[in-house]
Structures are given as structure tokens and as C-alpha cells.
């Protein structure tokens, strides 16, 4: 018999957890179905216990494996969280469940974000394409899309509701995702206490070097990391970025040592698992046991979690890798929604630290905008990996009140036409980054002076 502890709501609102011990937080093991029925020796006792319990909690997989639950109980409402990550076949059993001669569930509320990473599917775009006309008429055009996304796009406004409050990110971190990805929703802070703090760390800390000063004074930081010199390094690892990440972790630990929690304080996101091993190797050199337990994982596995401080190592070394890094990008109106980048940025509560090769990343319009945004907010360092790790760099400080020259002019009609036909489409759709940059340079160099 497991001893129940206060789980936050159990004493006020009893619930039963559907699942098994291996996939359940230890705090909730006593609420698993098999332990909840320990005091029910008879079938009638079980039926009464099930009837009295109003809330049942479980993953879609666990519920699908216990569909006989619906023969015993009827539900008025089912709330499906992270619904944008669940493919339609994983919900069919629950959606069509029956209790006696009626639907087992009266109403469904799906909660999700289609601008973040979708469910993982093994099918290619060609294999997942739907050709049946009846299915396409109901919006089912791609088997890799979730039911949530299909219904969101096809349902009237009366069936949809947007949550405009977010309680995770500090406003200084949330501003770029708001401008770039949530331009319609415009998420606002709740605000919670950490969203009102002036600095990411405890007040009164004294910096011991330039890296400490950087961490104490900047919310968003980009640290350039050049590609490694030697040719034996895998494209899926970047030792320069690994050293930068380890250096940051060492300083973060010193600044937060009194309250450091490996599951809350800091996390590291990378695109490749190969980079995880390289970062672990650099961490081991610090000889700080507490850092061995921090989470270093891919964006896909970080979705749904959060840390006070997030370090994102882009890792990539050549232009061809940009396709992998931006594979989950789609166009909405005139905006490009990079789902993977969106997830990475929005995991951070208090501080976001990025490192990557600006020459490679700058070929992508969204990454370019991100770096320029950080530059304008005094977080972009003009340094290299070795100098950064030594603390041999100067904190940027740009003017925030830009002076505009008196000389202005209107663009001629033929210039606007050429720009709209040649520049805007590649810039928006990212179909040809090289052509976009060359054409821009050509037009800029041949533009007339303001007085012509």
C-alpha cells in the first residue's frame, strides 16, 4: 500500500490516475487505479468507487488501453491537453467510446498550439497525402496533421477560443515570439512574480568577471561560434559551441548555487543527439557534480517542459543543415512560423542564451531577424568562442533612440514592382536564400542617392 501525499488537488478534488508505475510521477502512484481500488473487496464496492470519482486522468495511450472504463462510467466532459501533438488515430477510440446506448463522453475540449511541433509521424509527405475527395472536403488532407489543427482551421469562431495569457516567459523573452509567431494572438504575461523581476538572478549578486556581468544584465544573449577548424568533426557536433555551453553552465551554477535545482534552474537544447555527448564531455571537465543531472536534449523532447534558463546550441556547420533545422516551418499570411524555433525559445522562464554560427544562421530570414532583435537589445556579442570562454569580450551597448536623417525620398514605382516580384517572394518563402541575398545587394548598390 502506497502512502498518499498531498498532490496539490487530491485532497480537495479526488481523482484516479489511469496508467502504470513506470510512466507515473512517484507523487501520483498512490492514485493509480489499482491502488485506488485496494479498499474495494467487492465488485459493488468498485462500481460505487468509480461512480463517486468524478475525475480520471491519463495519457491517450493509457485510456485507449482501458476503454472498458467507459462501460462502467459516463463522462460529461473530456479535456485533451497537448492535442496538437496527437494524431487522429490515437483519438478515435476515445472519441467513439460508448456507454450503454449513448456516447460515453458528451463534450470534448481540445487544448493545444498548432504553431509548436506537431505529432511525430514516420510517413513522408507523399505517403501521408490524402486523395479521397470526401476526406479532403472535411479538411483531412495530410495524415500527419492532428485533429486539433484540422478542426481549428475549419471550425467557426464560436467553437474556438484563444488563451491570451501566458505564465512562463518573462516579457523580454516573450516579445520576439509574439512579434514573429503569435502576431495574431499577442500573448500577455499573467503576470506571475518571476515575470515582474528586473533581473534573471537574485538581487545583490556581484559579478566576478565579464561572463557573470553578461548573465546578470541581459535576458537574451547570442554568442557567435565559428565552425571547428578540423575536418574530422561530425556535422552534427560543434566543439566550440559545446565549450561555450559548458562555460555558461559553470557560471550559472556559481550564481545560483544556493538554490540550484537541475530539474528547474537550467536546461540545454540541441538539434542533434551527437552534440549532447560532446556537451556532457565538456561539463565533466568542470568537476561540478550538480551539473551532471541537468537535462540536455532535443527540441522535440523539450516540448511541454520549461526551465528558468534555457541554452540553445544551434550546432549546425553548413547551409544544407538549415533545411533540417527549419523542417517544421509553414507560412501563415505573410509570416513564416518556425515551429521548432518557437518551441526552443518559449521553454525559457527567465533567461535565454543562444550560441551558433551567425554566417550560416543568417541565411535564414527568421534566424536573421532573431539575431538582429537580440543585437538591438544589447545581447549580441562581437566575439569568438575562445575569447568568450576566457571572458575576454566587451558587453554591447547600442543607442536605443535612433536619430532619423532629414533627407527622405519616395521609392519610384518601378523599384517597388521589382522588389515585390523578385525580392519579397524568396524572402517570405525561403525557397532560394542565396538568390534573395544577391538580388537585395544588387538593388541596394544601384539605388539612387536621396538627392537624385
Predicted segments with their positions:
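Conserved small/polar residues in nucleotide/adenosyl-binding loops
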Residues: 1-5, 445-452
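Conserved two-lobed SF2 helicase motor
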Residues: 52-62
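Conserved helicase motor core of SF1/SF2 NTP-dependent helicases
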Residues: 4-13, 47, 61-62, 69, ...
